[in-house]
């Protein structure tokens, strides 16, 4: 055990020396445009996903407080045992209607959703054609499943077509893309992607974490 700790310590020291060690930013105020941290005051927050300001919206906060009185705090179970309450189904219905979809499922984070999606739906006879700049959660989710993997250049429809051609004999084909690529701000060419999906009989999976309610 001591040897393992020594290895971990050496690895951490190397990461720190390389300047790639990640320290948490500790925020001492609610999420908003300007925040305070333990090392600075009045910082302009440019890295949150609070695009619509819902985290500090008074109506949202009041509704959350009221929900505790009506529904209690916490699920007390996983969803499929006894952790699904009527309010969850109501929210799923509202989200599905907003997106124009048949149904939806709530996850605690998009990372969890992407991690569980592909393995659930796809097997060894299937294929995932993934944009090279997709979020790490999509990449990790793809790695967890047994489907064949194809990667196309970012937003490059000619390369996507070539990868679809290479995967044409697979049973189920899924094109996976970010809607808005979070690290670069590029917007996926969804009309062209969907046209190619129709041409090759593929499904389209879009991670729209950075677009829903904001870009459309």
Locate the predicted segments by residue.
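N-terminal "arm"/small-domain region of PLP-dependent enzymes with the aminotransferase-like
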Residues: 6, 10, 14-73, 202
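Active-site phosphate-binding strand-loop segment of PLP-dependent enzymes
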Residues: 50, 150, 154-206
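Conserved PLP-anchoring active-site segment centered on the Schiff-base-forming lysine
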Residues: 117-136
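Active-site-proximal loop->helix
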Residues: 120, 138-145
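Short, structured coil segments at secondary-structure junctions
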Residues: 124, 145-146, 200
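Conserved Walker B
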Residues: 133, 180, 208-210
């Amino acid at each position: 055990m001591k040897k393992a700790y020594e290895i971990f310590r050496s690895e951490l020291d190397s990461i720190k020396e390389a300047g790639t060690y990640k320290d948490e930013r500790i925020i001492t105020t609610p999420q908003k445009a300007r925040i305070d941290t333990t090392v600075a005051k009045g910082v302009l927050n440019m890295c949150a996903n609070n695009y619509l300001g819902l985290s500090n919206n008074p109506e949202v906060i009041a509704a959350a407080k009221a929900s505790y009185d009506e529904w209690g705090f916490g699920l007390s179970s996983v969803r499929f045992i006894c952790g699904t309450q009527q309010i969850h189904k109501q929210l799923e219905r509202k989200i599905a209607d907003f997106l124009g979809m048949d149904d939806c499922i709530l996850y605690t984070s998009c990372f969890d959703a992407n991690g569980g999606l592909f393995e659930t739906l796809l097997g060894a006879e299937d294929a995932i054609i993934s944009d090279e700049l997709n979020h790490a959660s999509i990449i990790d989710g793809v790695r967890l499943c047994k489907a064949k993997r194809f990667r196309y250049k970012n937003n490059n429809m000619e390369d996507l077509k070539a990868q679809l051609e290479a995967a044409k004999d697979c049973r189920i084909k899924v094109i996976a893309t970010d809607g808005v690529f979070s690290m670069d701000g590029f917007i996926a060419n969804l009309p062209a992607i969907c046209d190619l999906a129709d041409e090759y009989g593929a499904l389209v999976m879009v991670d729209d974490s950075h677009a829903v309610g904001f870009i459309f």
